Amino acid sequence: MALKYKRILLKISGEALGGEKGMGFDEPTLDAICGGVKKAHELGVQIGIVVGGGNFWRGRSSGKMERTLADKIGMLATVMNALAVSDKLEQLGVPTEVFTSITMPQVAPAFTRKDALRAMDEGKIAVFGGGTGNPFFSTDTATALRAVEVSADVMFKATMVDGVYDKDPHKYPDAKKYDTLTFTKVLEDQLAVMDGTAATMCRDNKLPILVFDLADPDNIARAVQGENVGTLVYEG
């Protein structure tokens, strides 16, 4: 089957790496997720990955800590996750290169668009850590930013649900799943796709978002080939 997308930016939440508990690294889960990424990579698609940090730290739950400091700790958590994902992919025989938005040359080179594109053109998966490098911005926004910067065809948001619903499907059995959505409806109805900053950036740059379930990591390869997976959000 032909590829629907030639270059994707994949967002993986930190909690996903933690397995059922959502904390730390769950080795079987990490194996499965990276195995799914490998299958997509073998199809010939160029891949960039942004990883969240919620399996180690959530700035919004940091109590009385000053928000800027809490977010900096969260950025460091995403770097740890980027290194772990990169290492697992390398173990599976997939070449990678890690880039950080925070200057830490002993760990990984700083992100530049030129270097990220060079890595992907060389067949490597570019793994981005450190969020945007600034407080008050989510890793969803970091994913949207990197996707726009590297001219990705689509942003993949791999989650714990199989798409976007009109209300929480875990709480409401009658929740309706959308196959497609416009950014206008997402923003007007405040649907739980991502924060408004990220959604607006994608809308303004005509970057579609595909939201799908990571419980089956093969969904990544299916989505790359254009199979009916998850919910597609686009600028209608």
Question: Where are each of the predicted segments found?
Answer:
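C-terminal catalytic "cap/lid" subdomain
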Residues: 1-236
